[in-house]
Amino acid sequence: MKKICRVAWSITHQEFTVTDYYYFSIIEKRAPEFGLQIDEVDSWDKLFEYDTIVFNYPEIPFTEKEVQDVVKAVEELGKKVILLGYYKNEDHIADTCNTLARAFGMELNPDEITDEVSNHDGDKYFVKSTKVRRYNKGLDNKVNVNAVVLPCTCSIKTIMPDIKIVVAGEETAKSNMENYPLLIADHIAPVSGGYFTLAGTCVFWDNYAIRLEDNLNFAMNMLWHETPPQDTPTGKAVRFGL
């Protein structure tokens, strides 16, 4: 039987909806080809029934309890959580995302990253990078991502050690606040097998950008996660999120 990864696309914090045909119909339509089932979820508790949880431009800050719920999901239950922001702290998006991200040792900077040299179609805000360190292989373990385009992205500040680079800008990428162009990063929970991924932009997988370079493959690779079996008090393994 072909493995299926169940993805909860949250709308619990007024995120961009994946069912918005104009913006996200491609990722929703193509997901099954990559073994992904994407559901829009409006119940906080229900989110944690899935393998991967996506917060795509949340507009409501996370409460302390919600942060602890997400920490438990990643560190104990082995879930994958993806949090995506935007450049320049538009609508205080960096501040909002950081109410959750700093629990995993990262923060979004309130800056903008541009690249006058490595970009799409001469637009410096459509930052192109070949420095894709993670999620560059498909389920067959073959490389299917060589470059991505990340439009309107901010950078990420690491505040704890052991953060993994997912995508960094090229040497020509610049921050208007002179920050290092770390654009997408991972926190890995080695015991549970969980992940927390933070991205400086939420539009690299919209209907326009997902057609650029290898963005489609990168998006699908990043969404994929298989929740590891967890041990119960009786010593029997169970699989969450299936």
Model-derived segments and spans:
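Short, surface-exposed patches at the edges or C-terminal ends of soluble domains, predominantly
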Residues: 1-242
